[in-house]
């Protein structure tokens, strides 16, 4: 909250905060819940972004992880209304344009932009 208050004092009016380093449902939800609490208590406008597709979780294949994001993570984030937006790290060695489109389409069905 200290950094948040500091940027507010410097004139920032809107702040985007992303999840994305948990790489599993439990940790992604934990980060998004913290962001939700900040949204409820901050004077600034905060938008939350689900970035579960930041990297592939260790021990999973690319397709297994994409399936986890689409079938489990996005629906739970959507049910709890924890994210306004979704982001995908679409780049060589990470998520392909096809995987990115699948993830974005799934998130859109849950109201994430």
Task: Annotate the PLM regions.
Residues 1, 5-6, 13-113:
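Metal-coordinating catalytic core of metallo-dependent amide/deamination hydrolases
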């Amino acid at each position: 909250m200290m950094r948040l208050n500091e940027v507010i004092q410097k004139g920032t009016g809107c702040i985007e905060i992303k999840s994305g380093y948990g790489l599993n449902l439990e940790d992604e939800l934990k980060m998004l819940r913290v962001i939700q609490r900040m949204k409820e208590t901050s004077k600034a406008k905060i938008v939350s972004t689900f970035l579960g597709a930041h990297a592939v979780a260790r021990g999973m294949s690319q397709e297994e992880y994409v399936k986890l994001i689409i079938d489990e993570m996005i629906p739970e984030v959507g049910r709890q209304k924890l994210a306004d937006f979704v982001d995908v790290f679409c780049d060589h060695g990470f998520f392909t344009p096809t995987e990115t489109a699948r993830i974005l389409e799934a998130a859109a069905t849950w109201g994430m932009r």
